[in-house]
Amino acid sequence: AWDNKQHWWLPSSFAQVVYGIMKAEKNITLMCGSPVVDAVVETKGNRNRVTGVCVMRQGMLQKVSAPVTIDATGTGLLAAKAGCEYFYGSDARKDFNESIGLEKSDGRVQPCTMMYISQRTRSDAEFPRHIFKTGVLDHDQEKWVTQQTEEEFRKIDSGIYLHWGATVECTDTTDPVLVADAHRCAMKKLEPQFEALNRAGYVTHVAPKIGIRECRRIKGEYVLTVDDVLLSLIHI
């Protein structure tokens, strides 16, 4: 964060944030349980024009029209449905004439991570820091737990920690079924940690969804290559 410290909140806090946004604005309509499934596109002129979306509501498609449509799906689904070109997985070196990269695209994306928070619930609880090699953070601190000395750790004594959790592969992060499989796989990997924390007097707040690092990459007006980065080229 701006003060070089770590700040995070319990997963359920998003509900308070959403409520705060709705309360602050006079013209917001929130449609829960109505996932976007398609883009409404007009093909007039020399390019497609997105005029809204289709959502699934009560088992039926409902059209929502808008002068401006923003793809905030996180997966690039709406842009793809509107006909935008996109990439998925690692590119081959020859795709963009890069000097570094794979000879052939392997179609793989970065792995997914299931994060969680542990919180002390017993007065005699002792955090089992010895079982964690990396990936544990105190709130409002600069150092990882594993970087702290025993004295520093006991002095901070926050009693609540953010865990990077388990990392797993997902063969296709655009497919909700396969993402759910990865979610279950990550939960299984975390069971020993959950059990150890529970024995030590801690409860766990697991993230509502597995963290996806990479999905569709929508092609923009310019494709930034690895050589651009190496040469420190700036595009405005």
How would you name each of these model-derived features?
Residues 32-33, 45-52, 56-68, 72-234:
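Flavin (FAD/FMN)-binding glycine-rich loop and adjacent Rossmann-like elements that form
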Residues 1-38, 110-116:
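Conserved N-terminal/central alpha/beta ligand/cofactor-binding core
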